[in-house]
Amino acid sequence: MFIIELIKGIILGVVEGLTEFAPVSSTGHMILVDDMWLKSSEFLGSQSAFTFKIVIQLGSVFAAAWVFRERFLEILHIGKHKHVEGENDQQRRSKPRRLNLLHVLVGMVPAGILGLLFDDFIEEHLFSVPTVMIGLFVGAIYMIIADKYSVKVKNPQTVDQINYFQAFVIGISQAVAMWPGFSRSGSTISTGVLMKLNHKAASDFTFIMAVPIMLAASGLSLLKHYQDIQIADIPFYILGFLAAFTVGLIAIKTFLHLSNKIKLIPFAIYRIVLVIFIAILYFGFGIGKGI
């Protein structure tokens, strides 16, 4: 039985790693795979299962941090990315504009404020199957609109051409994506495209902006719930974390490689199909009614 539970932990880590940064909603997939199928709460307990989801999310976040480690070092002016010794202000200003720490902070502000004000409310009232289906569907429509608009944009911007206003607006869309199922990456990439970024630039900024705020949010949640972790369940947590981290590395690199080629509409169609599938299970067969 213990082996079966470990396998379930690995499966959940894989699902988290595949979906956390893809524009398909990790929440929707965790409801489908865990709450409707594997039911980790039955062998971990509801509180410990919630903490497990925080841990595997951290695995995905660390994967994104690793993929973008060079960019983060550059943003923080660490190591070889710091200013050249003796370089004057005029020389610095003459360099091409680069994404900097202020862009990231400006993008984080809306979600940070909303999270501090409404995190408990969202956790208690919006994590139901119907609300997640709404988020999945509305987010899919938004992605389709963004992709249709992007066809009309000539010479879309790169990530280093983002200005502070664009960063703030994309940050607002990250705050909107706190509605479960809407998808953080789906929302922010769509908004970035609507703000005349190319898909790769919007994806890059989405991940760069998401890492610090998700680390902070998941870290705080883990501090609040760490006492729910049982010693006997630690192998379950470790395997789930490692699965999410490993699969997350592969998924993020693959998505970034394909982001300018396959766009958002295929993901939007997939989300609509997912909504229909979950709706059939929920309304037709009563699966997940207790969620």
Curated annotation (Swiss-Prot):
It is found in: Cell membrane. The keyword NAD does not apply. The chain crosses the membrane at residues 1-21, 48-68, 102-122, 126-146, 162-182, 203-223, 231-251, 267-287. Its main location: membrane. GO terms for cellular component: plasma membrane. GO terms for biological process: cell wall organization; peptidoglycan biosynthetic process; regulation of cell shape; response to antibiotic. The keyword Nuclease does not apply. It catalyses: di-trans,octa-cis-undecaprenyl diphosphate + H2O = di-trans,octa-cis-undecaprenyl phosphate + phosphate + H(+). Keywords: Antibiotic resistance, Cell membrane, Cell shape, Cell wall biogenesis/degradation, Hydrolase, Membrane, Peptidoglycan synthesis, Transmembrane, Transmembrane helix. Its EC number is 3.6.1.27. Bacitracin is thought to be involved in the inhibition of peptidoglycan synthesis by sequestering undecaprenyl diphosphate, thereby reducing the pool of lipid carrier available. Catalyzes the dephosphorylation of undecaprenyl diphosphate (UPP). Confers resistance to bacitracin. Is also required for virulence. Belongs to the UppP family. This is Undecaprenyl-diphosphatase. It comes from Staphylococcus aureus.
